[in-house]
């Protein structure tokens, strides 16, 4: 069974919410900060409480490495400890690293994030340099069932600068990326009909959502854009197949939920936000 199979089963059991642990130190409640601990240690405590509170309603977690790199060595220890905490909770974890290099460098990235202290179940990758920026990760997919989520059509405003450019045959650049990855993924299919090579598809392109889902029916989607970037449950539902086939990331919306729920502890508020998000998406899916 591949990690993508396990993610599919996690979504079936707990829903498609992907809790983004993009934990900026400024997000922490003032009364949670312990001056006797390092920032990294405090962030790990914060993340652990969030994991404990939300693991019953989270399909997976996504840990964005930049928030930890910015704190230097203590931050990278916090990153490793956070990955370990998620894995010990028995929930799939995505390392949001967006690596995009080739050859030996990519081999080292793959080893660094699929083994050892920074081991994760999935990594995010940027394909701009070509399929040889993806291939060094594939032995881990083949032998260990590891999964990839490759940037395809993203939710940021600047996506139009490259991704939306048209090719001579009328396709967009994101179509070319998706088509090549979809073809590559045929050799890495799992038991539940999804490839180990997933796509990052922003949840803010509702006008083409149904077409994208149908075109890449074998690809599991990592869907950013919910909440803070404008994606709504009724939009997100279009990217799913019977409520599965993708996970929907929310970071700030969950981490900062306590600010919209006065008097509620941050971990309880995060749980409430996950439940609300899960129920909203499930309702939207039921209307399709």
Predicted regions and their residues:
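Conserved N-terminal beta1-alpha1 strand-loop-helix module at the mouth
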Residues: 1-63, 68-81, 85-92, 262, ...
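Glycine-enriched alpha-helix->loop->beta-strand junction motifs that scaffold or abut catalytic
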Residues: 13, 58, 115-121, 142-148, ...
């Amino acid at each position: 069974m591949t990690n993508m199979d396990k993610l599919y089963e996690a979504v079936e059991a707990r829903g498609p919410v992907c809790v983004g642990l993009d934990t900026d130190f400024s997000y922490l409640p003032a009364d949670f900060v312990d001056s006797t601990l390092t920032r990294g240690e405090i962030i790990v405590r914060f993340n652990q409480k969030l994991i404990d509170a939300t693991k019953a309603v989270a399909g997976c977690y996504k840990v964005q490495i930049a928030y930890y790199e910015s704190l230097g060595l203590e931050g990278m220890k916090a990153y490793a400890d956070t990955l370990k905490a998620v894995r010990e909770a028995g929930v799939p974890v995505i390392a949001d690293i967006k690596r995009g290099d080739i050859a030996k460098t990519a081999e080292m990235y793959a080893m660094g994030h699929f083994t050892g202290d920074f081991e994760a179940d999935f990594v995010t990758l940027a394909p701009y340099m070509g399929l040889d920026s993806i291939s060094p990760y594939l032995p881990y997919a083949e032998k260990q069932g590891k999964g990839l989520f490759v940037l395809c059509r993203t939710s940021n405003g600047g996506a139009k600068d490259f991704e939306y450019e048209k090719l001579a045959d009328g396709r967009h650049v994101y179509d070319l990326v998706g088509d090549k990855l979809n073809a590559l993924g045929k050799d890495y299919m799992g038991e539940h009909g999804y490839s180990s090579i997933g796509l990052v598809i922003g949840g803010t392109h509702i006008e083409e959502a149904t077409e994208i889902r149908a075109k890449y029916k074998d690809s599991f989607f990592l869907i950013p854009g919910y909440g803070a970037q404008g994606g709504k449950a009724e939009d997100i539902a279009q990217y799913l197949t019977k409520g599965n086939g993708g996970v929907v990331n929310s970071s700030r919306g969950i981490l900062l939920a306590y600010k919209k729920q006065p008097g509620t502890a941050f971990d309880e508020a995060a749980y409430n936000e996950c439940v609300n998000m899960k129920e909203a998406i499930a309702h939207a899916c039921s209307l399709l």
